[in-house]
From Swiss-Prot:
Sorted UniProt keywords: ATP-binding, Cell shape, Cell wall biogenesis/degradation, Cytoplasm, Ligase, Magnesium, Manganese, Metal-binding, Nucleotide-binding, Peptidoglycan synthesis
Chief location bin: cytoplasm
Cofactor comment: Binds 2 magnesium or manganese ions per subunit.
Top-rank taxon, per record: Bacteria
Cofactors required: Mg(2+); Mn(2+)
Stored PROSITE patterns: ATP_GRASP, DALA_DALA_LIGASE_1, DALA_DALA_LIGASE_2
Organism: Ralstonia nicotianae (strain ATCC BAA-1114 / GMI1000) (Ralstonia solanacearum)
InterPro entries assigned to the protein according to its UniProt record, in alphabetical order: ATP-grasp, ATP_grasp_subdomain_1, D-Ala_lig_Van_CS, D_ala_D_ala, Dala_Dala_lig_C, Dala_Dala_lig_N, PreATP-grasp_dom_sf
Reactions accelerated catalytically: 2 D-alanine + ATP = D-alanyl-D-alanine + ADP + phosphate + H(+)
Protein name, as recorded: D-alanine--D-alanine ligase
EC number: 6.3.2.4
């Protein structure tokens, strides 16, 4: 495992990338953020001389991707139909190399229950959880997880549909709020402490963790609005924690990333428990935000990588996970 700084290829010729598509927008609840991310990526690629073009599957038939003549695409979609393996599967069918994780890793990481169960099998620390349903025994849920606790859709991002519940009486409404977005709803143990995030670049033994960022939100409320549209959230990069503790968290995040089979890039959210500093993995994002408020560009800047250079290198990592087998012949 490596945890040193990620260094872009110094001799990368932008023209060698060919015609690059930036897939943005889409049909998820995170469309607004995806448009911000994608337009930032598009501008960065063009500023480096790349022949880059937008493609929005929210307004164009997604099957039209095959006719665009893209040599590769940068996926700037967030949430469903973009971060869950669906667009990745389509691109595999079309034979168009793409950035980020493949079909299975994307699907696993998008599903919080699947992610947490897999991490548990690898003995990786993640908060306890219960899957909810309309007739749940709310008192039993609170007894198991304690209060406060978190209720959220199993397959949404950007804190959409999330509620911090402080009493049993609040659980039914929190469940209904999340259930309007997803049929699968999770109640998760609340970990009191510092919220961190850690970006990872690469694949397998070459996976590299970027510096940790500590997120300090007003009233510890790092919701959708505070993530993207306000300036009162404070980001500390590198996170002000001892170097040995930071290295342990980075190593844990790389383990979590590998366990899901992620490649290209990703970003994990972590809580550091207040009373003992123990880290807990919350989730893995396989198509992180690239807006002006986003955290991966911030971590990259901390090791001397500009937004434009990061995006250029990201585009260069586009690949296919599957190989065509139509030419296979038995030996």
């Amino acid at each position: 495992m490596t945890t040193g700084p990620f260094v872009p290829h110094p001799t990368l010729d932008p023209k060698s990338l060919g015609k690059v598509g930036v897939i943005l927008g889409g049909r998820s609840a995170e469309r607004e953020i995806s448009l911000l991310s994608g337009n930032g990526v598009l501008a960065a690629l063009r500023s480096r001389g790349v022949d880059a073009h937008p493609f929005d599957p929210g307004t164009q038939p997604v099957a039209g991707l095959a006719a665009q003549g893209f040599h590769r695409v940068v996926i700037s979609l967030h949430g469903r139909f973009g971060e869950d393996g669906t667009i990745q599967g389509l691109l595999e069918q079309f034979g168009i190399p793409y950035t980020g994780s493949g079909v299975l890793a994307s699907a696993l990481a998008m599903d919080k229950e699947a992610t947490k169960r897999l991490w548990q099998t690898h003995s990786l620390p993640t908060p306890d959880f219960v899957m909810l349903h309309a007739g749940a025994d709310w008192q039993a849920v609170a007894d198991r997880l304690g209060l406060p606790l978190i209720v959220k859709p199993a397959r949404e991002g950007s804190s959409i549909g999330l509620t911090k519940v402080t009493s049993v009486a609040e659980l039914p409404a929190a469940y209904e709020k999340a259930a309007r977005l997803d049929r699968d709803v999770m109640a998760e143990q609340f970990i009191d402490g510092d919220e961190l995030t850690c970006a990872v670049i690469g694949e397998g033994e070459h996976a590299t963790a970027l510096p940790l960022i500590r997120i300090v939100a007003p009233q510890a409320n790092y919701d959708y609005q505070h993530k993207y549209f306000t300036d009162d959230t404070r980001y500390e990069c590198p996170a002000p924690i001892p170097a040995e503790a930071a290295a342990r968290v980075q190593a844990l995040v790389v383990q979590a990333y590998r366990s899901l089979g992620c490649r290209g890039w990703g970003r994990a959210d972590i809580m550091l428990r207040k009373h003992d500093g123990a880290p807990f993995l919350l989730e893995m994002n396989t198509s992180p935000g690239m807006t002006g408020h986003s955290l991966v560009p911030m971590a990259a800047r901390a090791v001397g990588i500009s937004y434009e250079d990061f995006v250029l290198q990201l585009a260069a990592t586009a690949s296919l996970e599957l190989r065509a087998s139509h030419d296979w012949k038995p030996e």
